[in-house]
Amino acid sequence: MTKFGFLRLSYEKQDTLLKLLILSMAAVLSFSTRLFAVLRFESVIHEFDPYFNYRTTRFLAEEGFYKFHNWFDDRAWYPLGRIIGGTIYPGLMITSAAIYHVLHFFHITIDIRNVCVFLAPLFSSFTTIVTYHLTKELKDAGAGLLAAAMIAVVPGYISRSVAGSYDNEGIAIFCMLLTYYMWIKAVKTGSICWAAKCALAYFYMVSSWGGYVFLINLIPLHVLVLMLTGRFSHRIYVAYCTVYCLGTILSMQISFVGFQPVLSSEHMAAFGVFGLCQIHAFVDYLRSKLNPQQFEVLFRSVISLVGFVLLTVGALLMLTGKISPWTGRFYSLLDPSYAKNNIPIIASVSEHQPTTWSSYYFDLQLLVFMFPVGLYYCFSNLSDARIFIIMYGVTSMYFSAVMVRLMLVLAPVMCILSGIGVSQVLSTYMKNLDISRPDKKSKKQQDSTYPIKNEVASGMILVMAFFLITYTFHSTWVTSEAYSSPSIVLSARGGDGSRIIFDDFREAYYWLRHNTPEDAKVMSWWDYGYQITAMANRTILVDNNTWNNTHISRVGQAMASTEEKAYEIMRELDVSYVLVIFGGLTGYSSDDINKFLWMVRIGGSTDTGKHIKENDYYTPTGEFRVDREGSPVLLNCLMYKMCYYRFGQVYTEAKRPPGFDRVRNAEIGNKDFELDVLEEAYTTEHWLVRIYKVKDLDNRGLSRT
């Protein structure tokens, strides 16, 4: 044996080693491509919701699970407060705390914040591995490797899993695909073991994200379609009954879920299909014992009776309130106009808006075109598993169109079906590729019916390689430029191309933390509640949980009212400071003026705010303007005055008058005014955050001080 004889592996071992190497590279790529934000800025938590998750995780790591589960947070929703343990999905926090304690057990010292920052990239690597195994079950290892490489860099998934994006979706997509993989294994084998593993994966999913409802409706739908197509078998019966029974019992252990799996409308489809499975099994048993004529009579009688009983019982339970109706968010998925017409608090969230056509190309690129190819392959070679992935693809496509947030659910199946499609195209043309030299081929060896077969195959393979390369470059660019900027720290390009950093948010929160009393109550719009509580450690009135529409409406009424009426509301709520976000100086478009109409709509959606009419804030021609042509109601409301106080003296651009708003591209209409019930406490360097102190009540005969 030569010195390098150990490298002489069998074909099977070389194949396994190559697969392992490619999959490992995809997992490493998945982790590393999500680190742009850390390299460009620092290890920092992004967005809004992740700050609440970080705060609760830190409490869990320091105080333990018992105190965490029974934690009453008096810093949120003043004066109501919030019970934390029973109002969250704890999977994310428990996962981070477990990793933190395991690392410390091995004397690897790491701050809990860094665990939170890097958790989503870590789980994206796990997602890559699960995607490989799932796609392999649907076609082969080649398709699995392609799908794994695609999901490693797909922008639709990266948008919620970059370093610092510490949200439920960071681990939920892994849980979802793991549940699907276990389900397909259970369906293929009919094994109770695989079905039990599927139920455990489903339990992890339930503990992590409210999107578990999609799973518990998709799996029963799959079973129902298998029944209708005559594919139902003992394997499906064992798999579904085990998953449903065990999964339902486990899911009910999550406090936030409780008895919903047996009481809410969202879970009734799963229960109904479970009942159908029992009826189907009973019918099969009767068919084996009766002759065809007897069976036909009995079957029709039983089906009619059972259907009538189920409809009657279901209607009675719905009417008596024993089965709760669908929630607003789920109604919005079935009727996209529902939230806009009935629940403005849901419609006001940007991620609940319908998806634009451009978003599909931006977040998926090549996958948009290869998805139908994979779908066609699955339809052409139907199996129980491929029927499931077809249903997953079609349903997630619809839901992603209704709500842009659900692009996250669509991205994995786009990668899976595109991986299958690309693999099938490459396999087809690879067979036609002849790598032998043309001058050595005899005329007999050449196919007279297809003389340019080799050239066509080579061209198609080169075209596919080109598209895959452009997909990689596009995904990397989108990740770097669009999805790697933490909202807590903003950046822009200067005239010379240099990067300018705006750190006003943290500047304002630290000012609040060090310059206000510990018991100070801060009023702001609900978007910033989690950040204020986590970074400023001050009590807030409303936050991103949005569980009490009446309380949020009261804040909206204060923002939309005149100073005098707003002062009454602020005294009622015991407000000490008011915080607003203003982008007129820097050009930051996601400020409170641009969100103001949602405050008006939500403020006027309750009985106490019936006097607030959205039309009052428009001009007679129906425009929302902040200049002299703007509505007098708008120009004199509290939000307008807090944002534009002293702004009329500021020059924002050359050759523009003072008080020129760079977001609205207009000179403000109300410049010369003073505040009666508030006093300016702090304005950040770039005027992005403005904080006002609420004046005390008048002394008799004296003005407010």
UniProtKB/Swiss-Prot annotation:
Outcome after substituting residue 331 to H: Confers resistance to inhibitor N-glycosylation inhibitor NGI-1
Stretches assigned to the Lumenal side: 39-119, 159-169, 207-211, 260-267, 322-356, 403-406, 474-705
Chain residue ranges for the region called Interacts with target acceptor peptide in protein substrate: 525-527
Swiss-Prot/TrEMBL keywords: Congenital disorder of glycosylation, Disease variant, Endoplasmic reticulum, Glycoprotein, Glycosyltransferase, Magnesium, Manganese, Membrane, Metal-binding, Transferase, Transmembrane, Transmembrane helix
Site (Interacts with target acceptor peptide in protein substrate): 49, 351, 595
Name assigned to this protein: Dolichyl-diphosphooligosaccharide--protein glycosyltransferase subunit STT3A
Similarity remark: Belongs to the STT3 family.
Subcellular location: Endoplasmic reticulum; Endoplasmic reticulum membrane
Lineage, top ranks: Eukaryota, Metazoa, Chordata, Craniata, Vertebrata
Domain remarks: Despite low primary sequence conservation between eukaryotic catalytic subunits and bacterial and archaeal single subunit OSTs (ssOST), structural comparison revealed several common motifs at spatially equivalent positions, like the DXD motif 1 on the external loop 1 and the DXD motif 2 on the external loop 2 involved in binding of the metal ion cofactor and the carboxamide group of the acceptor asparagine, the conserved Glu residue of the TIXE/SVSE motif on the external loop 5 involved in catalysis, as well as the WWDYG and the DK/MI motifs in the globular domain that define the binding pocket for the +2 Ser/Thr of the acceptor sequon.
Glycosylation sites: 537, 544, 548
Motif mapping: DXD motif 1: 47-49
Cofactor(s) required for function per UniProt: Mg(2+); Mn(2+)
Highest rank taxon of the organism: Eukaryota
Residue ranges of the motif SVSE motif: 348-351
Example GO biological process: protein N-linked glycosylation via asparagine
Chain sites annotated for binding Mn(2+): 49, 167, 169
